[in-house]
Amino acid sequence: MVAQEQLVLLLMLLAGCRGGANAILDPGWVIPSKVEQLIGGDFNLSCTLNEDYFNGKSAEDCPVEKLYFTGGGRVYRDSKHIRILNNTTILFSDTNAVEQENDYHCMCDEYVINKSKVYVGTRPLLVRDFNCLDYDFQFMVCNFTQPPNTVITKYNISYNTNNDWRYSNTLDCNFDSAPVVTCNLTDDNYKRFSETFYFRLSISNALGHETQPITINHFERLVPARPGQNLTLLNRTESSVCLSWEMPRRSNYNRGLVWQVRVTPQNFEPITRPSWRNHTLTIKDTLCLTELPFAGYNYTLRVRVRANQNNTLWSEPMIYAFATAPAPPRRPPRVTYGSFYVYSSEKAMRFYWEPLEEHELNGPDFRYSISEYRINGTAVDPGLIKVESNSAMIDHWSMSAVHHFLIRSSNSQGLSVNATPMTIGPISNRDFKVREPRNIRSVYHPTNKSYTLSWDPPSDQRELQNYTVFWCVPKPGLQSECEGSIRFAEVASGLHHFTTSPDQLLTLHMAVSANYQSHNTGLHWAICSSDKKDDLAKMEPSIDVATSTSLTVSWSERVCAVILAGYNLTYCQRSAGRPDNCTTVTIDRYTNKHVIQNLVPYTDYSVKMLMYSDSRVSKYSDELVNRTGEAAPSQPRELQLIRVTSDSVELAWKPPLLANGVVRAYEGTFRSLHDNVTDTFRVSASADELVNNEKPITYRLGNLTAFTKYEISVRARTVYPSEPSNVILFSTAIGVPSPPQLYVINNPDQSSRLDWEPPRTPAGRIDFYEISLRDNNASCLTSTILPGRNLSYVMATPRCTSHNPFQLAVRAINVEQHPQLNGADAAEGAVLLMSTNGKGCEARTDALGEEERLQFEAYAANMTAYRLYRSDWGIYGFICTPDTHSVKAMYQTIEVTVAILVLGVIFYLVYKKYRKMSDIGLVLPQGIMETMKKPIDMGGLGLGLGPDSSVSGGIVCTRVDDSPPYTPQDLPHDFSSCGSESSKLLLRTASSSGGGGCVDRDGYDDNHETGPISAVGPPTSYLAMRHGLLVQNDRERERERDREQEREREQQQQQRESEMDREQSCTNGYIKPTQMKSWGGNGPSDNDHTFSVPSTAMTAPMSQPLSQIPLSGYVPVPIPQSRFNPAPVQPFGSPAVPSAATAAAASTFFPPAHLLNMDNYVQASDLHKLKPLVAAPLSQTGGPAFAGSSPATSPPLQLPPVHAASPAAATPKMADIGYTTMEQLQLTGLIKPPLAATVGSPTHAAGGAPGGGNQHSRLQPQINGYVTPQDLNAMAHNRHVL
């Protein structure tokens, strides 16, 4: 008991360990999972529930009390087999186990917890049929059958050839076709020439182990290869053939070989000859088959061979088909006395012979021929005789003549040597009367399938020698002709019957002839099946044709009709498998067919027959059972209506009383009385109707037209349709009409005339029409109810535009009264009424008469008693009144859309160009770099930039011109945009001019002698500055903050001045530099806004206030087309002003002023896009041109006097690059006129005297982002003062 508890605990422990691994997959475990036990032994199985699997489930899902086992077709629940160990485990025990191989399942109710495979069998059993075969010394195959055992058994086979098991080899076996095991021995260890093989079978399973030794005589198990390799036919004659073939491994058989030769003629038994020996050579074998019986005949040769040793095995046979050489037929056909037949016309005769057998034909193209034909000894052409395979026919036969024939056989090799003579003597009418057998009859014996022919002797038996009996297979419908061979036998004159051999065909034609010494009337065919004295045979009728009401029965004649009194035919209607209501009919003896009439369709009938004579009655034939065909059923009954709706009707009827077959379907026909259209429907029949034909059949016919009269009937159909049922008439209910077709005519007085056609499908009386005016979203604006008789209406329509179109719509309304609505009808009515609501407005009824209005209000107010069916809207598109610009508006919309798309694309391309140009860096030309290395004295600026300054840099060339007035309000300050276009343009300027621009500047700045000015435009001046001026320092940042504070104080004044400037001029433009650096200086001065500039052209220094001007903001801009350069600086001359021609030339060079107005911001990088105009020719003399110029054409600000260099310099120089200079802005009117504060300055026309001791008023632009033309003029003015 302790040991058992320990075993249970061990099993539980194993179950717990296994459950930890499979807790997710298995609801429990069965241990062990496989059991192998001896028959009669005991075994135990434990089943443990997996508690983790049942977590979260109710405890009653599978308690341990519900566990049980099933296996081997049994259920184990009792305490004898099941014992509960704990709250999760049970133990199953089985004693005295029987042989089995089953799955045992641990079950909880109908669910499987787990299973175990149980094998109960025996220890290993010894093999009984181990055998090996060696195939022509090539390989060995061994096989055996595993003894039956339910316990899995393994087999290991080893072998050797000297019985020394220290050295053995393993045999490779295939168990796929178990229980038959096949082992192959084909490796290099195969000892082909060893006589003995020793095998050892090691057999083991879970119940034991066995070793079985087996010894095989190798040579006795040899199987030679099939002979016939490279078979050759050496010779062939009419009775022999010689063959030759190879056998390569003949030398391996030391004791020689034994041959077996069998020759089988076609359709004969095999024949053997002791002389048929195999002439064996070293490699080839030669066999000659002699004394073969048939020429030109087919034979089959079978040759096999075995080793010349006892108990050896035969090889596979060589099978060879051959034919002997053909030869002429050996004999003619046989004939007998009386083997001819005289036709009833007595003018044609056919004579018969016995054909040769197939093996006697001796070759192809076999036939029979008449080699000689004589009539009364006179030779006649044999071609007059029609020769067939077993007979010949003479059409013009004479009964009084003697006919003599010679019959031969022939084939492709020629005629037979011998001929069969046949002579037919004259026949008289008396011979036909007294010398022919009488009452010829035959009896068929079905037991052995034989026939017996009987006859009565002729009236005249004198000189009667014997009888000849003939039999053959008759041709269909021809009693006097045979199909195939005719056989005959002689019968003694004292016998009057003949029985054929057994196993004859069912239809056999027999005849007999009476042979006299000098007379013969030929053969006479039997026409009777039996004799009176014989027992009447059981008939074998057959049912040939079955219709719905008749059966046609036929039978064959077994006896002559003259011996019969008639036939009895009995037929019975079968119910419940038994005959019932039988009827017997008597049939005339000369009849072989009868039709049974007036039968019930689709009913089983049994038929049997017998024949009777005056003295006998035959046994009834075997009963034939047949079923009549199907017929049309009776009509369906009691067709009636159950429910009618607007589009359907529910019908009911009862099945027909007489099905007369299988009712497959019901076919209904319904006709609309409105348009006389007929349609059909089909309802499949069910099997329940065969059981209960009183149960009504219901069908719902849909897709009907509302408010229409119909007539309907139903037919039942088997194979044929029945008569129609009763016809019923009904009308469908009122329904939803189809939408009217609306036409609208727009009137000029903002009204529209609506005309519509009635609904094609009114589905009712059309009580009302509803007219609706709706907006673009199909929302109702107005709705009007009209009487159902109205088909037109004029209504006011509002004026609409393309942004506010509207629709006109009309729909029909039917009203149906339903005093009681319940169930599905009420629900359907609610749906119909609710479907009419939507985005709408309240319908107006003022167009109705008083009575009609009250009716409509009553209908609408009482939805439970009335049902309103509204059709879909008949809509007349979107209209406008008037609608003359709809097409134009559409085109305008398209144009605006296209314009927006084009502008978007242009903006995107400009933005990409701007981004690309803003990334260009400043690279100065080499010439400018060299100039920047020279020391330049700028100490006069008061900025600490003298010759000794350590700040190095380049020079920026700019054009100097009189400064125009400006106001700070004109400047939208913005320095956030950076770019390098100016550097690129500066590089182009330097490279194109070769640095000449700065040379001109030096000539202008260093030679301030007075002299006349040429007629060219104002000269170009330059402002030289160090590269360090472009660098911003801390002091500059402080000044920036000061400027911001000052800007706030002057904001109000700037606004007022900006308004004045806008009134004076509207041509101010803005030039956004691509890059601006802050202005820098050495340090603060006493007055941040003033500094003194010495001038070589004046006797006293002039001091003017100057704002912090970022000189780097004025950038060179390329001119796409060349323009005139200013004249070179003259060393002497008097002050002058630009001439009118100069101003005109400058004004014609630039584009119109509207390109740079207050609303047109232009970046500096875009100035090169301004196309220059054609320049006017300039005057070559300065004085007259100046004198001739009027004050109106003089610029508002004038430059200091300059000197002409030489007369030759008056010729303008063409250049392909220029600068955006102040005179360009002035002459085009882009700058503002000078303010009052600047009038009287030395640069003004009125104050241009040399007495320039007066202080010039310095323009102070607030440069914070954008540069205006005024700012650039101020820069030029300050440079000139310097």
Curated annotation (Swiss-Prot):
UniProt-annotated glycosylation sites, renumbered to this chain: 44, 86-87, 114, 143, 156, 184, 230, 235, 278, 298, 310, 376, 448, 466, 568, 581, 626, 676, 703, 777, 790, 862
Keyword Signal among record annotations: yes
SMART domains (UniProt xref): FN3
Database matches in Pfam families: fn3
GO molecular function ontology, one term from the record: STAT family protein binding
Membrane topology value: Single-pass type I membrane protein
Topological domain ranges for the Cytoplasmic compartment: 911-1282
Keywords: Cell membrane, Developmental protein, Disulfide bond, Glycoprotein, Membrane, Phosphoprotein, Receptor, Repeat, Signal, Transmembrane, Transmembrane helix
Region Disordered: start-end pairs: 989-1092, 1238-1258
Domain of life per record: Eukaryota
Intrachain disulfide bonds: C47-C106, C132-C142, C173-C183, C472-C482
Compositional bias segments (type: Basic and acidic residues): 999-1009, 1033-1064
Signal peptide interval: 1-23
Compartments where found: Apicolateral cell membrane
Transmembrane segments: 890-910
Post-translational modification: Undergoes lysosomal degradation.
GO biological process: blastoderm segmentation; border follicle cell migration; cell surface receptor signaling pathway via JAK-STAT; compound eye morphogenesis; cytokine-mediated signaling pathway; defense response to Gram-negative bacterium; determination of digestive tract left/right asymmetry; hindgut morphogenesis
CC terms in the record's Gene Ontology section: apical plasma membrane; apicolateral plasma membrane; plasma membrane
Segments in the Extracellular topological domain: 24-889
Function according to Swiss-Prot or TrEMBL: Critical for epithelial morphogenesis during oogenesis; border cell migration. Required in the germarium for the polarization of follicle cells during encapsulation of germline cells. Required for embryonic segmentation and trachea specification. Essential receptor molecule for upd and JAK/STAT signaling during oogenesis.
Family according to the record: Belongs to the type I cytokine receptor family.
PANTHER family linked: CYTOKINE RECEPTOR
Subunit field text: Interacts with wdp; the interaction promotes internalization of dome and its subsequent lysosomal degradation; thereby reducing JAK/STAT signaling.
Protein name: Cytokine receptor
Organism of this sequence: Drosophila melanogaster (Fruit fly)
